[in-house]
């Protein structure tokens, strides 16, 4: 039996309990051997002022420390060129055994935007796609995805077979926490305790991150 590896990408600016709860639920539901949180690279002009990619990575490392099955994959931040998901998948897949299963977790909104992604039709050559559905999400996928869904979608998440190639949907009731809200609270000098893991809070406070400029 091959290993079951999940990839969960995000800007994690900062990583918060909503991300962590989704990660733990997915690792359990899909019986993953490992779920890698994958901080996404951004052009320097899109980074939050005063918070570097290295600091976003450091927060994720602290969030997953000691959490069974959760790890960090920093490869997108270590590239010196634009970071496309297909490049990441090819690079991860090249390190795995042929029978290892790779699951890429993405949100509904990201999934609906899939046809705009670089070489999007090749994504399923390397992984299964698990779409996290929210109860409040618009439930009709765009026209451009209908054929793909008809050919590749599997109703039962437990029925995904082989190293990749299929799409399934998982319902999650996400915690009402957002990175935008957390940045706003910190900018206003307010507490974000219990919205981020304690180790992340300690790092934010030690490095004075997300503070309003004085």
From Swiss-Prot:
Catalytic reactions of this protein: nicotinate beta-D-ribonucleotide + ATP + H(+) = deamido-NAD(+) + diphosphate
Keyword annotations of the record: ATP-binding, NAD, Nucleotide-binding, Nucleotidyltransferase, Pyridine nucleotide biosynthesis, Transferase
Pathway: Cofactor biosynthesis; NAD(+) biosynthesis; deamido-NAD(+) from nicotinate D-ribonucleotide: step 1/1
Molecular-function GO terms, alphabetical: ATP binding; nicotinamide-nucleotide adenylyltransferase activity; nicotinate-nucleotide adenylyltransferase activity
A biological process term (GO) from this entry: NAD biosynthetic process
SUPFAM superfamilies reported for this sequence: Nucleotidylyl transferase
Any Pfam family the entry gives: CTP_transf_like
Enzyme superclass (EC): transferase
Enzyme Commission no: 2.7.7.18
Keyword Plastid included in the entry's annotation: no
Job of this protein: Catalyzes the reversible adenylation of nicotinate mononucleotide (NaMN) to nicotinic acid adenine dinucleotide (NaAD).
Family, per entry: Belongs to the NadD family.
Protein name: Probable nicotinate-nucleotide adenylyltransferase
